[in-house]
Amino acid sequence: MRLYMPTKVFFGSGCVSENGAELKALGSRAMIVTGKHSSRINGSLAAVEQALQANGQTYVIFDEIEENPSVETVAVAAGIAVKEQVDFFVAVGGGSPMDASKAISLLAANPSAIDHAEERLYHPEPMQGYPVAAVPTTSGTGSEVTPYAILTRHDLHTKQSIAHKWFADLAFVDAGYVKTSSYENMVSTCVDALAHLIESYLNTNANAYNPVSYTHLRAHETKANL
């Protein structure tokens, strides 16, 4: 069995402010990738801004990430990143900003690919991207510690994972950010997490880590019966 998870993870209340100096190693100018509202409401965006300011790092904010972000959106963001001379990215939000940030970092580091985003993102020819830090504000997707990025492809009328594997360099996991989530969002993201556990439980390629899924499935069952 071989395991590879290069993301450096900080976990706990206030972990962004306590460990914000870690962002210094990623670059000098950031693009914060997020949505319109939730990151402002739950305080995660403010925490990231304060950390960057304390480090003396400049930044721009791209807050146009929609649910299930499209190839077109990440191409627009990448174009702005190139113009603004961004050299690293901070994703703030759920799976959508985190997945988008990975794709944006790849395109921004390869400007000639921006006008051919579908072709380059879904072609196996290797591409290197800029560093990414992730600040998840929901449970479920796990995108902060996986190499995958799923985008909406309007040309094919479907969602599809890009061909490139790109891990976040840093992840700041503060469970306090979920407190302001709506009931509907909380339910959907918890079901997402449960689905991942079931996937592991049913996986025919079992390994030594599969018992972890059994433990958490039993925990879900216990809570459901309370």
Task: Identify the residue ranges that each predicted region occupies.
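Short glycine/serine/threonine-rich phosphate/pyrophosphate-binding segments
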Residues: 16, 41-42, 71, 96-101, ...
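Conserved small/polar residues in nucleotide/adenosyl-binding loops
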Residues: 215-222
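ATP/NTP phosphate-donor binding region
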Residues: 1-88
